[in-house]
């Protein structure tokens, strides 16, 4: 039996995230949902973002209302930096610089049940999507804009920026179709010249998202890069 193809990983970028960082106290609680599809492991990415409860003041200070995705950056007891993205929800009456997350998740991420972290509006995060979503994305190309409801983020628009397959071969905006081709390149994606004017024939994928049902595991599209589309002037 052939190996199951892993779900498509989507990397989302927010060009309006900014640089504002707030130091917060993070408390682990039992009454916040934490399911297997919210976990990130070595084998798989999250299908849904875990939930973080924040005060209204912090929600507004970090301008989370536009997108609602918060990153917490922890330092583990052994000094390792760990970043976890969350779907932010306002809890009325919560102390201004306190964030509540699931107790089990906090233990996995920070090795503590209560700790401090840097909180900021997420600049980028990633989720995995099932094949039925991948199928709906099939046929779209680099530069196309689609509705965020397709990936569980209604009210937002996303623009496709590129992607790579399981072997690291990138999608190329100048190549039509969804197959793999060898083309002469003078620059990225697919080739980074060391000398001025240098060109090389390299393998790239076409600019179109393929239907996953027709792809082999070893060469399937593995990652799609998208950006929140606020308007062409911001991209």
Curated annotation (Swiss-Prot):
Disulfide bonds: none annotated. Keywords: Ribonucleoprotein, Ribosomal protein. Residues 190-212 are annotated as: Disordered. Coiled coil: none annotated. GO terms for cellular component: ribonucleoprotein complex; ribosome. PANTHER family: 40S RIBOSOMAL PROTEIN S6. This is Small ribosomal subunit protein eS6. The gene is rps6e.
């Amino acid at each position: 039996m052939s190996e199951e193809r892993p779900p498509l990983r989507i990397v989302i970028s927010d060009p309006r995230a900014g640089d504002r960082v707030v130091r917060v106290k993070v408390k682990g609680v039992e009454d916040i949902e934490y399911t297997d599809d919210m976990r990130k492991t070595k084998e798989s990415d999250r299908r849904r973002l875990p939930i973080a409860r924040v005060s209204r003041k912090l929600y507004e200070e970090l301008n989370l209302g536009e997108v609602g995705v918060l990153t917490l950056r922890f330092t583990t007891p052994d000094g390792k930096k760990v970043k976890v993205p969350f779907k932010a929800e306002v809890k009325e009456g919560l102390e201004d610089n306190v964030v509540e997350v699931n107790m089990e998740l906090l233990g996995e991420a920070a090795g503590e049940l209560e700790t401090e972290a840097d909180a900021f509006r997420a600049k980028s995060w990633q989720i995995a999507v099932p094949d039925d979503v991948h199928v709906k994305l099939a046929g779209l190309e680099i530069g196309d804009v689609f509705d965020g409801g397709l990936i569980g983020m209604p009210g937002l628009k996303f623009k496709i920026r590129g992607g790579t397959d399981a072997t690291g071969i990138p999608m190329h905006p100048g190549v039509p179709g969804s197959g793999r081709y060898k083309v002469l390149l003078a620059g990225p994606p697919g080739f980074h010249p060391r000398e001025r004017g240098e060109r090389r024939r390299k393998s790239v994928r076409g600019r179109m998202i393929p239907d996953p049902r027709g792809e082999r595991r070893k060469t399937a599209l593995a990652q799609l890069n998208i950006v929140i589309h606020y308007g062409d002037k911001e991209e």
